[in-house]
């Protein structure tokens, strides 16, 4: 994966490359007002990792969650405050929505279901 940053004043690009990382796939990238970005990754073993990337310094911190038996991350997005939200789906028909604190690794969650025959598919957060 590569992140390209445009400097409008200078008309130049800088870029940083990541990976490849065996078993990991970059899922989403969200750029926030404070010139940081959240990059969400999923692993084939069920883990989820959220990277907080500093666009001006190419530095980053990351927090990894899971894997959790029976649960699969179905969607990852950023909320209006810049924190990540993860939608998990369970083989029993339950869904869980996590709000992550990117700085501490703490999370809050709400679980729904189980709902027989239904699968959670995507998550989106508004302003």
Describe the residue ranges of each PLM region.
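Trp/Gly-enriched beta-strand/coil motifs that build multi-repeat beta-propeller-like domains
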Residues: 1-127
